[in-house]
Regions:
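Helix-rich interaction surfaces within compact, conserved domain-sized segments
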Residues: 77-83, 94-165
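Hydrophobic side chains in well-ordered alpha-helices
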Residues: 35-38, 74, 99-102
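General "foldedness" signal
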Residues: 35, 49, 53, 62-66, ...
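N-terminal, charge-rich interaction modules
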Residues: 1-63, 148-165
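Gly/Ser/Thr-rich loops at beta-strand to alpha-helix junctions
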Residues: 27-30, 56-57, 66-68, 92-97, ...
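Structural motif
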Residues: 19-22, 46-51, 60, 85-88, ...
């Protein structure tokens, strides 16, 4: 790939409002099973789908999950990204903050690019025959700096979610 021109593509992920997404990079065919087991161990009520793009061998999108809709959604997004060794996790009835340590602890996981409920787009770089994730566009830009009222509202929200006493 040395000396090959690079092109960039923005891939907007398909995601209902009530679904969170985690996008990362891993390696090895065992990734799908290990991510599934890590997620399943967090909570019996967590619904999820996982898709992983192989970068060599059969070069298939490997998939798993406990929710058919979320698994299909993860596969469609992985196919759209089409970057070697990338993975997509779609979550419902739980938040990324509840699973991030488990996801990052999976031995095959190299990087987590994003974990969000926001609209998200993946910046994909293509060079020669390969594709890779160059970056993430997560949500919208800020419109100001929080006031004391905003700080109080943030603290209330975290307590409503049960993350703070």
């Amino acid at each position: 790939m040395a000396g090959t021109a690079v092109s960039l593509e923005v891939v907007s992920l398909e995601k209902p409002e009530d679904v969170n997404v985690i996008v990362g990079q891993a390696h090895f065919i065992k990734t799908v099973e290990d991510l599934h087991e890590a997620l399943a161990g967090v909570s019996a009520s967590l619904r999820f789908g996982v898709a992983f793009c192989e970068a060599s061998g059969a070069r298939l999108v490997r998939r798993s999950g406990n929710d058919g809709e979320l698994t299909s959604l993860a596969v469609r997004n992985a196919e759209a990204i089409a970057a070697g060794h990338s993975f997509v996790i779609m979550l419902r009835d739980g938040f990324p903050v509840n699973v991030m340590n488990q996801v990052k602890a999976v031995p095959e996981v190299c990087t987590v690019f994003c974990a969000t409920a926001n609209p998200v787009a993946i910046l994909v770089a293509a060079a020669g025959d390969g594709r890779g994730i160059a970056g993430v566009i997560d949500g919208l830009p800020p419109v100001g700096v929080e006031t004391d009222t905003d700080v109080a509202a943030r603290h209330r929200l975290l307590r409503e979610f049960g993350y703070k006493l």
